[in-house]
């Protein structure tokens, strides 16, 4: 069962096809095979992408873009298609990796600001040149979370300071071109999943 994957759907790009990126390391395909409605792209003998064509035959997807926290119903539909094609299935996602945090400290650092962010059960550190007020709720990702098929966050050392979180902007989520941290204005629990919050609204 595949644990690490990222879904993408856009009628403008793939014309009624659901894209499932299976490997975090972006590589160019060297082989393609077809299994009924599923096109599989391979690199070095390993599947790197599933493309389910004619997805509207099976289910209706209303959103456009990356699906960071797919519903169990959608995964069940996808897995039914994959099983019929004789392919490995997807695990349910328990969370998206996009977490709501509360800024508890801000310190000028180098040319920007170092932030301490409370995620309920842990404190993480993020760096940006953007000034954000203490006590604001923001959206961050931690190590290993994918933004798209080519970009994912890894912890790094910034002149002696460990940076283990990254502020998410509207631009990161293709909501707008605004490259500023998303501020959560409505009531939201610190440590909760941003996309679960969106789904519950």
Language-model-detected regions and their locations in the chain:
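Phosphate-backbone binding interfaces of nucleic-acid-interacting proteins
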Residues: 1-201
